[in-house]
């Protein structure tokens, strides 16, 4: 990998969302990414050109380990749903203009079903335009509602929490 990467978080802040971000960051650095940008508040933040250089915030192996255990969404999240491509081409043009400005080689989005929809739409638009940026979705959802998956990261944590809570209620009754 020779270019820059941008990563965002979207949807609910599950236990897996920051672990996924730590894994994306570490892998990108290990594979030679020049810069790893983080979208503040997901795709909505990117549309507002609100992003940070993660290497300024994650500087040591300890920072990566702490990020894995940090609650909530480190970059901030959103629930903004991209319009269909033909309904609002200007939105897509704006996103791709920002990606070009940052020289993004790979766009990574961590989230649930709507986040994977965002990745699909951006990937489809890149194909239509012949744009070289690669788009990758990192699934995490407590709802376990992603097509073609059995269990998504985040779902196991939610199921365990519910099971433990029910067990404690039974013991207290």
Task: Name the predicted role of every residue range.
Residues 1-52:
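N-terminal phosphate-binding or glycine-rich loops at protein starts, especially the Walker A/P-loop
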Residues 4-14, 73-79, 105-111, 137:
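Short glycine-rich or small-residue beta-strand-to-loop segments that form or flank ligand, phosphate
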Residues 19-24, 113-133:
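Short Gly/Thr/Asp-enriched flexible loops that form oxyanion-binding sites at enzyme active sites
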Residues 50-105, 114, 142, 151-162, ...:
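Glycine-rich oxoanion-binding loops at beta->alpha junctions
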Residues 1, 6, 29-31, 65-69, ...:
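Solvent-exposed alpha-helices and their adjacent loops that cap or buttress functional pockets
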Residues 10-12, 39-45, 79-80, 112-115, ...:
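Short, ordered loop/turn segments at secondary-structure junctions
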Residues 36, 123-152, 156-161:
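Short, acidic/small-residue loops that bind anionic groups at enzyme active sites
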Residues 17-20, 47-53, 86-87, 118-123, ...:
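Short acidic, glycine/serine/threonine-rich loops at helix termini
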């Amino acid at each position: 990998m020779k270019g820059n990467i941008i990563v965002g978080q979207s949807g609910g802040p599950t236990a897996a969302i920051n672990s996924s971000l730590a894994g994306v960051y570490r892998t990108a650095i290990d594979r030679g990414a020049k810069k790893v940008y983080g979208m503040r508040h997901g795709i909505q933040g990117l549309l507002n050109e609100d992003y940070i250089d993660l290497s300024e915030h994650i500087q040591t192996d300890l920072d990566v380990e702490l990020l894995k255990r940090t609650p909530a969404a480190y970059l901030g999240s959103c629930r903004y749903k991209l319009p269909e491509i033909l309904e609002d081409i200007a939105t897509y043009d704006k996103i791709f203009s920002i990606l070009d400005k940052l020289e993004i080689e790979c766009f990574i989005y961590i989230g649930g079903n709507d986040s994977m929809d965002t990745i699909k739409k951006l990937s489809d638009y890149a194909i239509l335009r012949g744009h070289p940026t690669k788009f990758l979705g990192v699934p995490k959802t407590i709802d376990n509602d992603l097509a073609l998956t059995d269990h998504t990261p985040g779902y196991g944590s939610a199921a365990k929490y519910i099971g433990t809570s029910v067990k404690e209620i039974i013991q207290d009754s």
